[in-house]
Amino acid sequence: MITRSRQVALALTALLTAGAACQARDHEPPKPPAPAPSAADTGAFTLVASGDVLPHDSIIERARFDAGGRGHDFRPMLAGARPVVAPADLALCHMETVYGANGDYSGYPLFKSPPEVAKALAATGYDGCSTASNHSVDDGADGIRRTLDALDRAGVRHAGTARTEAEADIATVLRAGRAQVAHLAYTLHTNGHPLPADQPWAVGLIDEARVVADARAARGAGADVVVVSLHWGTEWQDEPDGDQVALARSLTAARTGDRPDIDLILGTHAHVPQAYEKVNGTWVVYGMGDQIAGEMVNDQGVRDPRGNQSTIGRFTFAPPDRAGERWKVTKAEFVPQLFDVDAGRVVNLNRAIDEGADVRAVRDRIRDVVLSRGAAGDGLVMGK
């Protein structure tokens, strides 16, 4: 149960979410400001992407508390991200876990999350989510089916897992302004669990040749922008590992004619924020960290606050001067976040600092990691 001490929000969260932390069943976050008209006038669009949604047992318990004991409500948890997510033309999350049903929910090590997570993602403003992860087959084919069914009901698109071979063969394409954006997603492994029997297509596994082939197929089918989500890397490592760096170089070097096959790479899995880097002219986010997770313990068995730190990437794409050329990123930003495990809320750290919260050291640590591979020199800036 939620103890009295855990019902008391930390001061930094209270500063930001006094109105958003409503526990009523009909909680609706305030409507965010509309995107700047200038972006729409030029045909440009903004894309935001965030890290792992990883509901541990404590997160499930918190959502039940926020729902007043009747079901689960994850919307208050995500309310702090909504002012960044909802105004974007296209918003992508990473849904790390599969969903259970009828109260059969669990956290680590075999996750089965309440399907109400999908409703909260939609309410926050997410248009789609990558679903390929090391936990994709925690409950076999049934878990994949329940997850994608719930996302469909909520109106949230998905990429990376599939219920049928036909679904696996078709790229997820989303509209962002006047652009068609293909979203592809893959994971390095599934924690040693085999894919469902006779369903080798159920989870997208990282294979360089396959990723490039899928990106080219999506482009050939009419995608203006191709975004690839990769669940990769070494857990609890701030720096991208050698395999991440090598694969990023290879994927961003892939071209058809003079046009790169991939326009943006979004990384998850490490549990900690990792660097952003422009590689071969393409932005790569090695790792966005965990957007929602319980109190995290690292691979040394030690409570590690980095596991509740993350970023939202925000990229503005502008259309080419001539048809068939590349949509270019004209602005690249990152927004540092913290998940306040005591209050059960996502906190935008720069907004918290503006309101007087003493979280500058956490924000600065995230900033230093994000910029550690020279991204500032290529124009990456910190946003709110």
What are these regions (language model features)?
Residues 2, 22-384:
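Acidic, metal/ion-coordinating pockets
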Residues 1-26:
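Secretory targeting and sorting signals
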